[in-house]
Amino acid sequence: MTKDFIVKDIALAEFGRKELDIAETEMPGLMALRAEYGDSKPLAGARIVGSLHMTIQTAVLIETLVALGADVRWASCNIFSTQDHAAAAIAAGGTPVFAIKGQSLEEHWDYLDRSFMFEDGPNLILDDGGDATLYVLLGARAEAGEEIIPVPTSEEEEAIKAQIKKRMAASPGWFTKVRDQIKGVSEETTTGVHRLYDLVKQGQLPFPAINVNDSVTKSKFDNKYGCKESLVDGIRRATDTMMAGKVAVVMGYGDVGKGSAASLRGAGARVKVTEVDPICALQAAMDGFEVVLLEDVVGSADIFITTTGNKDVIRIEHMRAMKDMAIVGNIGHFDNEIQVAALKNHKWTNIKEQVDMIEMPNGNRLILLSEGRLLNLGNATGHPSFVMSASFTNQVLAQIELWTRADAYDNEVYILPKHLDEKVARLHLDRIGVKLTPLDPEQAAYIGVKPEGPFKPEHYRY
C-alpha cells in the first residue's frame, strides 16, 4: 500500500506523541468536546480538508475532529510553520498529512492539492488564511474559461497558477466538482476572513463560511495573548538579542499589534507604534505607547515588527535607512507586509534556519526573520497550547455547525453565536482555577439576561 502522507521523518512520531500528550492537558476545550461528542460522532460522513499550521496544537485539533467522526486530510498553510514531529505523529496515527518545515512554494501548493484527494472528494474546508478556499475557487474559474492571474506578480502567484494548471490537466472538471460539493468553510485568521468578505461583495462565495477569527474567544485571546507570549519567544530563539533597552517599532495596533507591543514591552523594550486608524492610534497612545511615523524612527530603532495584514508596510527604502543589524520580522499572516522581493538582489547570508543577514548598499546589515513570514511559527513554535485550545474549540464547533446545519446558512459569512463563544470560555476556566460569580434571578432580570447567559448582546465589544 502506498503511503498517503509526506513528512520529514516518520521516525519523529514518538517524540511528537509525547508532546501531544502534554498539549492535551493544556487544551481543555478540545478535550471537553471529545468527551461531549465522542459517542454521538456529529462529524460522521464529513471529509475535511485542513489548511492550517501543522503544529502540536493543530495535531490535537485534528485528532479531535477524527474522534468526532470526521475523515481528515491536512496541509500546512505556511512553508515554515510545520513542526515535523507533530506531522509525523499525525501521519503515524493514520491521518494523511502533507507538511514539512521549510517546504518550497511549489511543494506548498502541491501538498495542499494532495489534501483534497479524498476518494469521494471533500465536503468541508477548515482554512487558515484562505489558501484552500482560494485554490478551489480560482481553479473553478479557470475551468470556466477565465484567465486567472494573467501576469503573476510574485513567486507565490506563479506557484499557485502552475499547480492549478497541473490539476486541470490531470483531472478535467475537478475544481468545479469539488466546489459544488463543499458544504462550507471555517476560517481562522483576519487575512482569510478579509478574503471571504471580498468574495461576498463580489457575489462569488459559493458556500457558507463561518468567521472563527471574530469569535471573541479567538481574536481577543489567540491574537492578543498568544502574540504576547510567542513574539518575543521567536525573536529570542532567532537572534539571542537582549530586548531590554532596545527600541522596537510595532506596525499596527489591532489585536495582534496589541499583543505584540505588550510582548516587547514585557521584555523591557522601548516600544513605539505606527497606525493608520485613529481609534487604534488613540488606544496605543492611551496604553502608553508613542505613536509615530515609521519614517521618523526607521534610522534609530533596533527591532521592526509588522502586524497589520496589509502589504508594503516596510518598503525597500525603509530597510535601506535602517541602522546596522536592525531586526526585521512579521507576525501578520502573509510575507508581503515586508518588501522581501525587493531584497533579492542584495547579498544574503544565511545564519541558521529562518534567519538571514542581508547587506544593504551602504554596508549596513539587517537581520530578516523567516523571510518575512510568521516569525513566531518560523523561528519558534507559535502560540501556547492553552490559548490555541480556545481558537480550535471554535473551529470544531464551526465544523459541527456547518456539517449538521448546512441548510440553515446562505452563502454568506457568519460568526458563531454568543452562547457558543461563552461556552468556549467556560470550558477553559477550571484549568486556571477561575470561579464564576452566579447571578440570582433578580439580578439577571434587572440587566435583561438569563442567569446562565448569554451575558452580553451580540454587538458588545469586549
From Swiss-Prot:
Binding site for substrate: T55, D128, E188, K218, D222
Entry's Gene Ontology BP terms: L-homocysteine biosynthetic process; one-carbon metabolic process; S-adenosylmethionine cycle
Pathway the protein acts in: Amino-acid biosynthesis; L-homocysteine biosynthesis; L-homocysteine from S-adenosyl-L-homocysteine: step 1/1
Cellular localization per UniProt: Cytoplasm
Keyword NAD applies: yes
GO molecular function annotation: adenosylhomocysteinase activity
The entry's keywords: Cytoplasm, Hydrolase, NAD, One-carbon metabolism
NCBIfam families: ahcY, PRK05476.2-3
HAMAP family with a match to the protein in the record: AdoHcyase (MF_00563)
Family from the record: Belongs to the adenosylhomocysteinase family.
Protein name: Adenosylhomocysteinase
Organism this protein belongs to: Roseobacter denitrificans (strain ATCC 33942 / OCh 114)
